[in-house]
Amino acid sequence: MSRNDYEPRRSTRARPGFTIVELMVVIAVTAVLASLIVAAVMSGRESARRMECSSHLRQIGIAVQEYHSIHGVLPCSGLLGFRYISPLVDGRPGNWNVYGAPDPCMLGSCPEAGDWMRPRIYLCSSDPEVRRTRRSGSYCFSAGNQLFGVGQRGVSDGVGFGDVDPTKVISFRNITDGLTSTALASEQLISLTSVAASDVEYLAAFDQALADQNPLRYIWNSTGTFSLPQDMQAMCAECDSGAAGAVPHFSGNPFNVRVPSYNHTRPPNSRACMPSAATMTGPMSPPTSLHRFGVNVGFCDGSVRFVVNGIDVKVWHSLGTRNGGETSSGL
């Protein structure tokens, strides 16, 4: 018997394994599945944040209704209105006890905002900038369907009336368009500045680069002479071009400014526009958010609806007025 008879025979059959093509296919499929899972998780988180934002507006609406049942009028617009309903929102007394006490705004002696820490319910978690400052807030009352200016009084055809004026109080009986068809409050993105968070953040120098990257967080100026309401569309076209520069948004950041308000002059998530002419002293300041396709809007009956960016302009205008007599079908 030869020596070779005792040596094991080697199999000529190829061993099973992955080819490079198969490996690449597996990696590609894994990457696609991972991206789908991440997208689903992110979408789910944003849906949860949008629902939380809707819940905040609903609680604000309920607090306003309770405030009305106590005082017989709606709270004044701006920060002070939010301060007055804060005990009804989170149970903390704040600086003024509104339970059973007359509204200082109604008596013509409205205090300044002062050093006030905002309740968490006034923050929308979809906007990461709410964590930057102590006094920034996400929500604002409706100033109606017309221009308004900081410090002006009694200029709103909505439920908010600009600055404090004891002769311009509004009650539910003044909302003849119906509580279910009249917007009460919505949301706005907080503006950005180039300095660290502080009480005087709004005094920081304007940062054009930040504004260009975040156009919905600022009020954009116009350079042309627009002095009549019918010129508003021309003014907006100039503002949308971004050529005129911008200023920090007074109604979002900081929250210690008197008039956190928005109006229905432009559709949701449009640029805010500030005219240059003195006869148009207030901006066109629509609600803005990071929610996909629209914003949450709270109504005077306590309900909250999601309004898409492409809403019919006439319907949007009608939702802003309290006594315009328009129909708001189509929302």
Q: What are these regions, as identified by a protein language model?
A:
Residues 1-18:
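N-terminal leader/signal peptides at the extreme start of proteins
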Residues 2-6, 29, 62, 119:
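Short acidic linear motifs
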Residues 8-11, 23, 28, 281-286:
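Intrinsically disordered, low-complexity segments enriched in polar/charged residues with Gly/Pro
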Residues 12, 32-35, 39, 273-282:
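Amphipathic, alpha-helical segments enriched in basic
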Residues 14-49, 59:
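N-terminal single-pass transmembrane signal-anchor helix
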Residues 43-331:
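Internal low-complexity, small-residue/proline-rich segments
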